[in-house]
């Protein structure tokens, strides 16, 4: 038996009759085509989360060791050091470049490694807290000064503090207490060990100048 005809207000009586079965079949077919188009679009979209998607060859030297890597452009230097190279001295504090816990040196300059793209260090020399002691295991003068002056409590910020302090001396910004405070202001210590940090830098600065001056003589 035919389905009852659906009447539409104001319809043209000369048009072919629209029946319920025809309406339902047409609607179902349209929905199926829309779903197929959506699935095809999803299949053709790039997989932005794929580990191999858009990697970039990068070569850098970390603490004297050469590394040839394929990195995603969005990988930070901090994540490369900690998660791929196993160098966990640099800490992820704020991950916004505001605390200094992730400070490392790139070609001798201090940087916030959480804000530095790893691919931007291609061809560079990176030094972390793990790479500043002498070959015979002797601590760097700044490390020893931090120990001698109790310039730490929990120790979480200490690697970044030490790396920033070394750079502060090498930049020539450790000639007065006021200057040290100014140029170390980007490194925060939640434990409040600032007095010890200041004393450590004050003591280590002439030792560093003497040793490094002798090295370059």
Question: Where would I find each of the regions flagged by the language model?
Answer:
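Signature of N-terminal electron-transfer/Fe-S-associated modules in redox systems
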Residues: 2-217
């Amino acid at each position: 038996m035919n389905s009852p005809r659906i009447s539409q207000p104001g319809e043209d009586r000369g048009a072919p009759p629209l029946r319920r079965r025809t309406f339902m079949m047409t609607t179902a077919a349209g929905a199926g085509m829309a779903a197929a188009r959506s699935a095809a679009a999803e299949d053709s979209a790039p997989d932005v989360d794929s580990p191999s998607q858009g990697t970039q060859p990068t070569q850098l030297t970390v603490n004297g060791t050469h590394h040839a890597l394929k990195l995603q452009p969005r990988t930070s230097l901090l994540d490369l050091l900690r998660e791929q190279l196993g160098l966990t001295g640099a800490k992820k504090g704020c991950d916004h470049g505001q605390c200094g816990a992730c400070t490392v040196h790139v070609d001798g300059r201090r940087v916030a490694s959480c804000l530095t793209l790893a691919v931007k260090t291609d061809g560079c020399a990176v030094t972390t807290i793990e790479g500043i002691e002498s070959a015979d295991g002797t601590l760097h003068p700044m490390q020893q000064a931090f120990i001698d002056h109790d310039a730490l409590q929990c120790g979480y910020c200490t690697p970044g503090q030490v790396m920033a302090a070394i750079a502060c001396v090498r930049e020539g910004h450790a000639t007065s207490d006021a200057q040290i405070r100014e140029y170390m202001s980007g490194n925060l210590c939640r434990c409040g060990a600032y007095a010890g940090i200041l004393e450590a830098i004050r003591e280590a600065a002439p030792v560093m100048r003497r040793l490094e001056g002798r090295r370059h003589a």
